[in-house]
Amino acid sequence: MSKGRLFTSESVTEGHPDKICDAISDSVLDALLEQDPKSRVAVETLVTTGQVHVAGEVTTTAYADIPKIVRDRILDIGYDSSTKGFDGASCGVNVAIGAQSPDIAQGVDTAHETRVEGKADPLDLQGAGDQGLMFGYAIGDTPELMPLPIALAHRLARRLTEVRKNGVLDYLRPDGKTQVTIQYDGTTPVRLDTVVLSTQHADGIDLEGTLTPDIREKVVNTVLADLGHETLDTSDYRLLVNPTGKFVLGGPMGDAGLTGRKIIVDTYGGWARHGGGAFSGKDPSKVDRSAAYAMRWVAKNVVAAGLAERVEVQVAYAIGKAAPVGLFVETFGSETVDPAKIEKAIGEVFDLRPAAIVRDLDLLRPIYAPTAAYGHFGRTDIELPWEQTNKVDDLKSAI
């Protein structure tokens, strides 16, 4: 980036219609994994005015009361009254769940390496659940090694929900979005340019007299005070609150929502590339999810080891095969050692076969519902296995 370039990322709150769907899908997944860790799950959710539709494919020995899971999660998010446009206690819930395709199952249960090539390694038994490409990224912008724009957007979204739920701003409603524009000098963030914050609110709240000053003081300035970034000037940012002038009608009444429609919010805010696969509602046999988590784990450890200031890693799979068909490492000229050595070290330190990823990150657990909002990467409020920097010494030794 040349001097003076502006980069923008956005986040949304847990009450955004698409995020309601992600939360429901991952809550169903967790309920099944808790009883049967080997559950195969692909659950999609749609919400609209007064209705929730849950569909997909599941193979499991577990039982989940899906309508109850749906209602409990919606109520927890904060949609508990028709005055808010949606009520988890009274909305309609329709469930249409079938079994996983046996054609897919045979490739996952018995990989090409075992079925055709005759390999005996247990980690060659499980094939990838689909073809596809997944990216991981890390950068030294923040202590959690995430790009600053998305990290700040998530903090603002979490704070917006916090002041609603703890009663500090009790007139707020669950639906909301945040957007952060930061000025860069090269790759260094130097100035916070613009914050856009749209939040659903009770009727009759004055935008200029109440909402905007409350959001500036209780949300934005509180988050910025805790940010403590060394190079970022936050003294003269522009704040735009509800630029349409009013946001009373929100949630599923304002917009229909679908699982998997916030994949850039879920990852790196557009700063890094994305393979296209969504996460929520998918068990770890789906490499869309598990391999994207593994790539973040790889990238974070590379940066934490001091091998590069920023790195993007791509992996690719063929459905039904265990071994990746490709690995690509990009350090953007920020490396401290030969990138070819970094790529070789990654191959030696990390086993990227699906069964190995599941084993090393302990993914057959009900840990997914908390990831459904505020990002899957760089989380500081919950512990996630792919955020560990436990391979730093191994990478240094391999180099």
Swiss-Prot record:
GO molecular function terms attached to this record: ATP binding; magnesium ion binding; methionine adenosyltransferase activity
Domain of life: Bacteria
Binding note for cofactor: Binds 2 divalent ions per subunit. Binds 1 potassium ion per subunit.
One GO location term (cellular component): cytoplasm
Annotated K(+) binding sites: 44
Catalysis: reaction(s): L-methionine + ATP + H2O = S-adenosyl-L-methionine + phosphate + diphosphate
Cross-link (Isoglutamyl lysine isopeptide (Lys-Gln) (interchain with Q-Cter in protein Pup)): 341
Keyword annotations of the record: ATP-binding, Cytoplasm, Isopeptide bond, Magnesium, Metal-binding, Nucleotide-binding, One-carbon metabolism, Potassium, Transferase, Ubl conjugation
CDD domains: S-AdoMet_synt
EC id: 2.5.1.6
Binding locations of ATP: 16, 175-177, 246-247, 255, 261-262, 278, 282
A single GO BP: one-carbon metabolic process
Enzyme class: transferase
Region of interest: Flexible loop: 100-110
PROSITE patterns with a match to the protein in the record: ADOMET_SYNTHASE_1, ADOMET_SYNTHASE_2
Binding-site list for Mg(2+): 18
Main location per the UniProt record: cytoplasm
Localisation: Cytoplasm
One of the Pfam families matching this protein, by short name: S-AdoMet_synt_N
Record: residues binding L-methionine: 57, 100, 255, 286
PANTHER family in the record: S-ADENOSYLMETHIONINE SYNTHETASE
Family classification: Belongs to the AdoMet synthase family.
Assembly description: Homotetramer; dimer of dimers.
Functional description taken from the UniProt entry: Catalyzes the formation of S-adenosylmethionine (AdoMet) from methionine and ATP. The overall synthetic reaction is composed of two sequential steps, AdoMet formation and the subsequent tripolyphosphate hydrolysis which occurs prior to release of AdoMet from the enzyme.
Official protein name in the record: S-adenosylmethionine synthase
Gene: metK
